[in-house]
Regions:
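Two-component/phosphorelay signaling modules centered on CheY-like receiver
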Residues: 13-32
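C-terminal output helix
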Residues: 21, 101-118
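Acidic, metal-coordinating helix/loop segments flanking the phosphotransfer/catalytic sites
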Residues: 33-51
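Short amphipathic alpha-helix used as the core "switch/output" element in two-component signaling
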Residues: 42, 64-75
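The feature encodes the CheY-like receiver
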Residues: 59
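Hydrophobic/aromatic residues positioned on beta-strands within the core alpha/beta folds
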Residues: 81-83
Length: 122
């Protein structure tokens, strides 16, 4: 199966992070994982990822600061934010998938974003 791209999953909930990693790997993606924004920074420094799937609410470098970081420093990356909680007054400049989500539906969202958006422009 040809490689479909390198995806970084940023999720503090172990069961979601690991099962999503396994699911996307079986679908042909290379997958990196991080449990918080700090771990994601390390991955982003070491690898040129094609797409980021990130939880919004994480204890370490999550929430509004993580979104601000992504907006400023990852504006050319394809990004999907996942969350069961988003503040209505904070604008998310990326695609959002609400928890709980179906992995098949999330993959369809990833495929669509990879095909239609070669990367965000600053």
């Amino acid at each position: 199966m040809p490689n479909k791209g390198l995806v970084l999953i940023v999720e503090d909930e172990d069961s979601i992070r690991l099962s999503l990693r396994d699911y996307l790997s079986k679908k042909g993606y290379d997958v990196l994982v991080a449990s918080d924004g700090v771990g994601a920074l390390k991955q982003l420094l070491d690898y040129d990822v094609d797409l980021i799937v990130s939880d919004y609410r994480m204890d370490v470098l999550g929430g509004d600061y993580w979104i601000k970081f992504l907006r400023k420093y990852c504006s050319t990356k394809r990004i999907i934010i996942t969350s069961g909680f988003l503040r209505p007054d904070f604008e998310i400049p990326f695609d959002v998938v609400y928890k709980p989500f179906d992995y098949h539906d999330l993959e369809a969202h990833i495929v669509a974003l990879m095909e239609t958006n070669p990367g965000r422009q600053p």
